[in-house]
């Protein structure tokens, strides 16, 4: 067994690729070491094409292992279960830049597995896995037009940084994952803190310079250990038959696609497709599949030609024209906030729920973030596209779209100090014809403002498309479903008036250059501002008051040493407060205490109980107290009453301090149960409280 090791530096840390030591049964395997982060990436391929499919069967799995960060998995079973949301997002991150680089028409099943074996938090395993996937595929016999590489770009104090450390990431206004080949960008994914479009552009191409170096590094590896690629036999239709199909199908599709209504257009396109097949399969029955493929390509060519040569789209819009936008808030009466966003035939209902801080989501992954208090979920039911499918929970697409919309709003969500609530937004896609994820961004903004969440600025989003033939290209604003399916790029961008908060770019060709990225960013901003203006017509700022159905929140700060008094032995005291008031109470280690109630009176009552428990006796302060015990030398007076079975705070009024004149017997002045005004004169070293009634009487006489 020959083991090969290759090394280069990326962002000042060693990137080591090991070939030949592990996973030798796979078509290709690479053990990637980036600092102390270790990722094994394997690529395997079926020997024969999968029959009866019209798509490329690529599967990418990202396997997080808890031992990689020295953890034992939680739960009863104590082993890793189904993929976490973060693992799903990482798998998608690997899939997107490699998928366009396989041969067109390739139908062999491909399985790429990235297993995370060790994680050093300064060195991200997901982008390391993208480079690892490229190495594994490139050195294997699987046909692949790579290599590709990926890096993360941060922005700290105005300076762009490759692969920022955890400390740098916490200060960064940008977290952008960029993947590409030596020639072009393939994929961009990230979030930002209202960063200008020009800076985003610079970040993308700053990343590309580093990517080129990593690609050069991979090419050296491939030259040394790369295998010969397997022969792929992709059936091709006879040129004469193909020419006849194109000539027959083109006028049918030119008429069918020019219908603004999605359902009518799809019906006409299906009818045209059937006409083509009926016309040719009688003469060439054995070529039916290839004829259908050419017919699909013809339809695609018609749509693309309209955009490139005529500057027109299937629904009659210009390239930069946005579909009709309508916005409504308060669509639902009982939820804490709701917004209905409609753009053309895409419609999203976003609903906001406010909850206690303790309801924030706790994450059991490999990252440094262990909890989050802003949560966005995206649902895409089959009826939204007029289809019938089983509904079995969120798939990879729903998780990815939900995360993108969540990232878009994260930069404007108020801090816990400003707004001590956990916030959950659910976006229900009611109708979809393109860009439902960006519809979720707009709907979320409307819903949050209606709920009274003091977001820093409203956020709008838009999806851009691309048609590219040679050096010619056309960029389309607010793409619909057919333009997404038949175009070369899906470029989603969200942000405020000030700048970008989220960006996602998926390329279906072999990459895009600087000119295209610049043009797309500029045109996207114009579209975003148009949509934002429409949104602000529905609601121009967050409501000042929360919904009457939202929980009332009182925030208190108590001495951390008093936390155990509020909780009580075995939680007895805090449970009594909850039972008595119906409130929910959360206490943090720093003494931050949150009272959440369905009505204001209950919250005030709970606050009174807490204040009574943690109250401290103050020297010099006058209290109305109750005489609890009488001794020969004085009376013990409770000055802070106990609540819910807790002990109150009392002090001693010495017999000499009961009155201005001499007192022979305590009971001559006070008796048990009497309420008297007393002043705290001293708290001695043992914590004993000395009180004086005489001092209060003297003060009253002076007045």
From Swiss-Prot:
Gene Ontology MF term list: 3'-5'-RNA exonuclease activity; magnesium ion binding; polyribonucleotide nucleotidyltransferase activity; RNA binding
InterPro entries: ExoRNase_PH_dom1 (IPR001247), ExoRNase_PH_dom2 (IPR015847), ExoRNase_PH_dom2_sf (IPR036345), KH_dom (IPR004087), KH_dom_type_1 (IPR004088), KH_dom_type_1_sf (IPR036612), NA-bd_OB-fold (IPR012340), PNPase (IPR012162)
Cofactor(s) named in the record: Mg(2+)
GO cellular component: cytosol
EC assignment: 2.7.7.8
Main location: cytoplasm
Keyword annotations: Cytoplasm, Magnesium, Metal-binding, Nucleotidyltransferase, RNA-binding, Transferase
S1 motif domain sequence ranges: 620-694
UniProt keyword Iron-sulfur present: no
GO biological process: mRNA catabolic process; RNA processing
Catalytic reaction(s) noted: RNA(n+1) + phosphate = RNA(n) + a ribonucleoside 5'-diphosphate
Gene3D superfamilies membership: GHMP Kinase, N-terminal domain, K Homology domain, type 1, Nucleic acid-binding proteins
Subcellular location: Cytoplasm
Residue ranges of every copy of the KH domain listed in the record: 551-610
Residues that coordinate or bind Mg(2+): 484, 490
Functional description taken from the UniProt entry: Involved in mRNA degradation. Catalyzes the phosphorolysis of single-stranded polyribonucleotides processively in the 3'- to 5'-direction.
Family according to the record: Belongs to the polyribonucleotide nucleotidyltransferase family.
Protein's name according to its UniProt entry: Polyribonucleotide nucleotidyltransferase
Organism the protein comes from: Syntrophomonas wolfei subsp. wolfei (strain DSM 2245B / Goettingen)
Native organism taxonomy: Bacteria, Bacillati, Bacillota, Clostridia, Eubacteriales
């Amino acid at each position: 067994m020959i083991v090969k090791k290759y090394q280069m530096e990326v962002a000042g840390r060693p990137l080591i690729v090991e070939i030949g030591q592990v996973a030798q049964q796979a078509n290709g395997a690479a053990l990637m070491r980036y600092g102390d982060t270790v990722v094994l990436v394997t690529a395997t391929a079926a020997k024969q094409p999968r029959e009866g499919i019209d798509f490329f069967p690529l599967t990418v799995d990202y396997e997080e292992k808890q031992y990689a960060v020295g953890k034992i998995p939680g739960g009863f079973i104590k082993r890793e279960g189904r993929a976490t949301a973060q693992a799903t997002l990482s798998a998608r991150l690997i899939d997107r830049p490699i998928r366009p680089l396989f041969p067109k028409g390739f139908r062999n099943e491909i399985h790429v597995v990235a297993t995370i074996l060790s994680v050093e938090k300064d060195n991200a395993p997901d982008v390391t896995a993208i480079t690892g996937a490229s190495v594994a595929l490139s050195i294997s016999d699987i046909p692949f037009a790579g290599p590709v590489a990926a890096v993360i770009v941060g922005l700290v104090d105005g300076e762009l940084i490759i692969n920022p450390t955890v400390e740098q990431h916490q200060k960064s206004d940008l977290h952008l994952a960029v993947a590409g080949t030596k020639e072009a960008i393939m994929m961009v994914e990230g979030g930002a803190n209202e960063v200008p479009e020009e800076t985003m552009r610079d970040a993308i191409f700053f990343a590309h310079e580093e990517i080129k170096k990593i690609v050069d590094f991979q090419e050296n590896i491939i030259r040394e250990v790369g295998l010969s690629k397997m022969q792929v036999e992709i059936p091709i239709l006879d040129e004469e038959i193909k020419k006849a199909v194109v000539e027959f199908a083109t006028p049918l599709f030119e008429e069918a696609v020019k219908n603004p209504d999605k359902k009518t257009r799809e019906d006409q396109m299906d009818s045209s497709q059937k006409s083509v097949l009926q016309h040719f399969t009688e003469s060439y029955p054995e070529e039916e599949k290839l004829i259908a493929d050419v017919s699909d390509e013809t339809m695609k060519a018609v749509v693309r030609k309209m955009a490139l040569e005529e500057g027109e789209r299937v629904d009659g819009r210009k390239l930069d024209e946005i579909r009709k936008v309508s916005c409504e808030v308060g669509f639902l009466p009982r939820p804490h906030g709701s917004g209905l966003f409609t753009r053309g035939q895409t419609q999203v209902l976003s609903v906001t729920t406010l909850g206690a801080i303790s309801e924030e989501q706790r994450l059991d992954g490999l990252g440094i973030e262990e909890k989050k208090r802003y949560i966005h979920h995206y649902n895409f039911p089959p009826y939204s596209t007029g289809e019938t499918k089983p509904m079995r929970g969120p798939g990879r697409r729903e998780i990815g779209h939900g995360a993108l919309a969540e990232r878009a709003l994260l930069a404007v969500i108020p801090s816990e100090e400003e707004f001590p609530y956990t916030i959950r937004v659910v976006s229900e896609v009611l109708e979809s014809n393109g860009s439902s994820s960006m519809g979720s961004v707009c709907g979320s903004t409307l819903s949050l403002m209606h709920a009274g969440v003091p977001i820093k600025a409203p956020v709008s989003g838009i999806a851009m498309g691309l048609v590219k033939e040679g050096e010619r290209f056309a960029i389309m604003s607010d793409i619909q479903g057919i333009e997404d399916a038949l175009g070369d790029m899906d470029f989603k961008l969200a942000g405020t008036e000030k700048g970008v908060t989220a960006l996602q770019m998926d390329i279906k060709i072999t990459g895009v250059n600087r000119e295209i990225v610049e043009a797309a960013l500029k045109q996207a901003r114009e579209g975003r501002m148009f949509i934002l203006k429409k949104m602000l017509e529905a609601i121009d700022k967050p409501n000042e008051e929360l919904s009457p159905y939202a929980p009332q929140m009182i925030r208190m700060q108590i001495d951390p040493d008093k936390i155990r008094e509020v909780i009580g032995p075995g939680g007895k005291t805090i449970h009594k407060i909850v039972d008595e008031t119906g409130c929910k109470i959360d206490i943090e280690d720093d003494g931050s205490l949150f009272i959440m109630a369905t009505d204001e009176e209950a919250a005030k009552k709970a606050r009174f109980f807490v204040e009574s428990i943690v109250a401290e006796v103050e020297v010099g302060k006058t209290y109305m107290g109750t005489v609890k015990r009488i001794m020969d030398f004085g009376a013990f007076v409770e000055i802070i009453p106990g609540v819910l079975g807790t002990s109150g705070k009392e002090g001693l009024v010495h017999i000499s301090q009961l009155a201005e004149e001499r007192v022979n017997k305590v009971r001559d002045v006070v008796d048990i149960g009497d309420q008297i005004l007393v002043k705290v004169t001293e708290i001695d070293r043992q914590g004993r409280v000395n009180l004086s009634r005489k001092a209060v009487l003297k003060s009253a006489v002076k007045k």
